[in-house]
């Protein structure tokens, strides 16, 4: 009985709880539906089509006087029926305007303000766009550029340009302009109108006026700079000699005070040939680096350091990260013939090696006014390697064009218009001479850019028909750090026993009709006991192992060096390093290339056999070499061994005091650059109109013999 009462009691309580929960749910449902309806009404009021045809008198009159009426803005393009909106037109605004209508009017006011601001921004952007377009002239936009990383440099350049433009507003320039022809008078009626414009608009109009009427002169500069170079600042070059143009005239009419112009003029003198400092600043008479100082540009990292950081992108088939390690020397190799300092060096890493050697150069200066030459630490070969086999030629040119723009805007460039600058490329010159009319051809256009043609370019192979390209030795496997290592290796080469008369390491070139490699390999096979042949056929790994290659050269008295895909071979320097006398078949393989590093008397260190005689079967290589007297062979070998230091690159960490009296290929190349720049400087100071007084196709002849008279080698260098 007690249990039944207890059960009935709990049942009654349960129903109470259930009923209360149900009532609470109904209340919440009602509140939710009411809130949703309110939100829906507000959303409908905020729709654009529901706020368009509102009467003007219901909008608070708190706009600025110069703003346009709201009804003109919102009713131009859209017409929507707003009859369903709860708006009362006849009721007084202060008494009958609903809360929703106030929200709508506030929104309309906000939209109107936003429209006015956008209109002002649009007008400003159009004016600025026209001004920038006028400054660019007719230059076509570049398809690919690395502008993001050069943004800081661009801002600096704009400030420099502004200073240089203001410099031309000095009183002296005013007087010079008064003597100019009357082609400026066409703009006199425009000047009073410009005086009425505010300062900002005056600056914009001045920029437009100083560039747009100057199309003819800017076209000349752009044509000289290969059309797709950015040459809007080409007038700052050292060669500027044309009369002043409309650009300077308009600037002289602005409201800048003459006193300010005089101060700026003294601080930034215009770059004219007569006033430019061609010679470096004098130092003390007993300065050991006098005339040898070199300044190294601090170019943006994307032109060198970032290429090494992203080394995995340089080649699809080769691990360039490994090959660019150890200052560009590559992986360390075991000692050879008891001498240390051997590395698996790739022939295309010369740029990295040279850069690291320059960091240790004894006459490197941070003061560009002392420098006799300026080094540009750009890695053009590695940069090109990334896109060499790609389908987009413009990507091969992008970084080079950006660098040229950066150089043109530097103060060091303006001193001699870049003629005291030099750069190193670890590839042959043919990789950098793609012509504009053949965009799909191999390589890029670096060597034909106007700026580079003013510079001195160091490559592992130069063109015989080029003013500014000079060849330097290929990197070898030996990079000693001390004087003792050099002497030890030379002594080892003098004592070594050489079993074979001559040897050849290479592959045939059946696709090249004028190649003599097949004939050479046939003659070597015929001289079984006197010739050693290492045929680099497909799949053979011996030709890629430094120790195997050096063993071949160490066992031979003469090493054959016929041309391959190009005139030169890295094998030439590997064989000389091994004390093997080189045998050349074309003067372009060494004699007309490495004019700074090899002796003028070619018979002292090499043998020359005309390739035509080999091709036609008129000569036996074995007979020619066997007839050389033994005493002469010893003398030639001694000369080759003495050449070894000049044809290799010391370890970049080595100091000049560590290597003693020896000069390596780097030292010889820098001396050659300094001598060439000094010659150009003298010709400029003498007022020579032409820097070179001989045709460019005879460059090889002038560099080798000092004249362009007829020579027996002329048939070898007939232009193709």
Swiss-Prot record:
It is found in: Golgi apparatus membrane. It is a single-pass type II membrane protein. GO terms for cellular component: Golgi apparatus; Golgi membrane. Pfam families: Exostosin_GT47. Residues 1-13 are cytoplasmic. The keyword Amino-acid biosynthesis does not apply. The keyword Electron transport does not apply. Residues 114-124, 148-162, 171-197, 230-245 have a biased composition (Basic and acidic residues). Glycans are attached at residues 82, 214, 237, 254-255, 438, 454. Expressed in roots, hypocotyls, cotyledons, leaves, stems and sepals. Functions in xyloglucan synthesis by adding side chains to the xylosylated glucan backbone. Involved in the galactosylation of hemicellulose xyloglucan. Belongs to the glycosyltransferase 47 family. It comes from the Eukaryota. Residues 35-720 are lumenal. Its EC number is 2.4.1.-. Keywords: Glycoprotein, Glycosyltransferase, Golgi apparatus, Membrane, Signal-anchor, Transferase, Transmembrane, Transmembrane helix. The chain crosses the membrane at residues 14-34. This is Probable xyloglucan galactosyltransferase GT11.
């Amino acid at each position: 009985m007690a249990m039944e009462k207890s059960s009935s009691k709990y049942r009654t309580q349960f129903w109470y709880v259930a009923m209360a929960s149900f009532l609470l749910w109904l209340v919440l449902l009602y509140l939710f539906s009411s809130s949703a309806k309110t939100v829906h009404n507000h959303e409908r009021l905020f729709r654009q089509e529901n706020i368009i045809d509102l009467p003007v008198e219901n909008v608070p009159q708190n706009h600025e006087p110069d703003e346009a009426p709201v009804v003109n803005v919102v009713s131009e393009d859209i017409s929507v029926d707003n009859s369903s909106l709860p708006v009362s037109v006849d009721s007084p605004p202060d008494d009958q305007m609903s809360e929703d209508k106030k929200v709508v009017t506030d929104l309309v006011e906000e939209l109107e303000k936003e429209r006015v601001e956008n209109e002002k921004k649009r007008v400003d952007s159009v004016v600025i766009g026209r001004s920038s377009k006028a400054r660019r002239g007719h230059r076509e936009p570049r398809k690919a550029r690395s502008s993001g990383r050069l943004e800081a440099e661009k801002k600096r350049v704009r400030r420099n340009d502004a200073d240089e433009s203001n410099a031309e507003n000095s009183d002296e320039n005013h007087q010079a302009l008064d003597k100019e022809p009357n082609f400026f008078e066409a703009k006199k009626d425009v000047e009073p109108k410009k005086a009425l414009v505010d300062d900002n608009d005056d600056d914009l109009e001045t920029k437009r006026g100083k560039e747009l009427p100057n199309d003819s002169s800017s076209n000349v500069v752009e044509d000289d700079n290969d059309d797709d170079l950015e040459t809007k600042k080409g007038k700052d070059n050292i060669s500027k000699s044309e009369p002043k143009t409309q650009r300077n005239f308009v600037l002289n009419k602005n409201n800048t005070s003459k006193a300010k112009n005089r101060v700026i003029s003294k601080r930034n003198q215009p770059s004219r040939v007569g006033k430019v400092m061609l010679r470096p600043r004098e130092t003390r008479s007993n300065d050991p680096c006098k005339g040898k100082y070199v300044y190294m540009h601090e170019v943006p990292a994307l032109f060198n350091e970032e290429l090494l950081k992203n080394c995995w992108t340089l080649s699809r088939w080769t691990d360039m990260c490994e090959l660019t390690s150890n200052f560009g020397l590559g992986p360390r190799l075991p000692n050879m013939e008891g001498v240390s300092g051997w590395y698996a060096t790739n022939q295309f890493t010369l740029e990295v090696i040279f850069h690291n050697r320059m960091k240790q150069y004894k006459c490197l200066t941070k003061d560009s006014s002392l420098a006799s030459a300026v080094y540009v630490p750009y890695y053009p070969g590695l940069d090109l390697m990334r896109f060499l086999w790609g389908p987009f030629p413009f990507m091969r040119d992008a970084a080079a064009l950006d660098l040229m723009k950066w150089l043109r805007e530097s103060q060091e460039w303006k001193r001699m218009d870049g003629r005291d600058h030099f750069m190193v490329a670890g590839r042959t010159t043919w990789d950098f001479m793609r012509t504009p009319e053949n965009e799909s051809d191999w390589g890029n256009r670096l060597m034909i850019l106007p700026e580079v043609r003013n510079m001195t370019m160091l490559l592992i192979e130069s063109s015989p028909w080029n003013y500014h390209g000079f060849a330097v030795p290929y990197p070898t496997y030996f990079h000693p750090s001390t004087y003792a290592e050099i002497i030890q290796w030379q002594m080892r080469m003098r004592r070594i026993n050489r079993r074979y008369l001559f040897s050849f390491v290479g592959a045939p070139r059946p696709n090249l009709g004028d190649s003599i490699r097949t004939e050479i390999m046939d003659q070597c096979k015929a001289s079984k006991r006197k010739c050693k042949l290492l045929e680099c056929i497909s799949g053979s790994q011996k030709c890629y192992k430094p120790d195997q290659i050096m063993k071949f050269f160490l066992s031979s008295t003469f090493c054959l060096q016929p041309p391959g895909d190009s005139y030169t071979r890295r094998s030439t320097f590997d064989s000389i390093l091994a004390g093997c006398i080189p045998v050349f078949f074309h003067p372009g393989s060494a004699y007309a290339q490495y004019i700074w590093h090899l002796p003028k008397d070619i018979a002292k260190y090499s043998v020359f056999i005309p390739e035509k005689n080999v091709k036609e079967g008129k000569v036996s290589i074995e007979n020619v070499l066997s007839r050389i007297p033994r005493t002469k062979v010893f003398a030639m070998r001694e000369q080759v061994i003495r050449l070894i230091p000049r044809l290799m690159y010391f370890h970049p960490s080595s100091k000049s005091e560590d290597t003693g009296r020896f000069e390596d290929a780097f030292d010889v190349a820098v001396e050659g650059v300094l001598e060439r720049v000094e010659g150009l400087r003298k010709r400029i100071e003498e007022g020579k109109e032409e820097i070179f007084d001989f045709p460019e196709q005879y460059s090889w002849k002038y560099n080798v013999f000092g004249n362009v008279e007829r020579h027996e080698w002329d048939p070898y260098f007939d232009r193709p």
